[in-house]
From Swiss-Prot:
GO terms for molecular function: structural constituent of ribosome. Gene3D superfamilies: 2.40.50.100. It comes from Bacillus cytotoxicus (strain DSM 22905 / CIP 110041 / 391-98 / NVH 391-98). The keyword Kinase does not apply. Disulfide bonds: none annotated. Residues 1-9 form a propeptide. The keyword Ribonucleoprotein applies. The lineage of its organism: Bacteria, Bacillati, Bacillota, Bacilli, Bacillales. This is Large ribosomal subunit protein bL27. InterPro entries: Ribosomal_bL27, Ribosomal_bL27_CS. The N-terminus is cleaved by ribosomal processing cysteine protease Prp. GO terms for cellular component: cytosolic large ribosomal subunit.
Length: 96
């Protein structure tokens, strides 16, 4: 006697889910002005989270730790000791 062994396979593949596949938008942090560059008062110099760079002369710190120029002048990035950096804005002398 002949025996038939029939097997049925799934005609549709099971659809799995993934926990990956998304990312947050970049926050565009970092330096916005270079050392030696001329800036006007209110210009954003550095966007950061926390105090990676500290405010120096004529530089203010916003609520989100953004550093901005308080006066017109030239940007200077400087070292404070071994492990700290600061950014300052020095006014340019006007020739009369």
């Amino acid at each position: 006697m002949l025996r038939l062994d029939l097997q049925f396979f799934a005609s549709k593949k099971g659809v799995g889910s993934t926990k990956n596949g998304r990312d947050s938008q970049s926050k565009r942090l970092g330096a916005k002005r270079a050392d030696g560059q001329m800036v006007t008062g209110g210009s954003i110099l550095y966007r950061q989270r926390g105090t990676k760079i500290y405010p120096g002369v004529n530089v203010g710190r916003g609520g989100d730790d953004t550093l901005y120029a308080k006066v017109d002048g030239v940007v200077r990035f400087e070292r404070l000791g071994r492990d700290r950096k600061q950014v300052s804005v020095y006014p340019v002398a006007q020739e009369a």
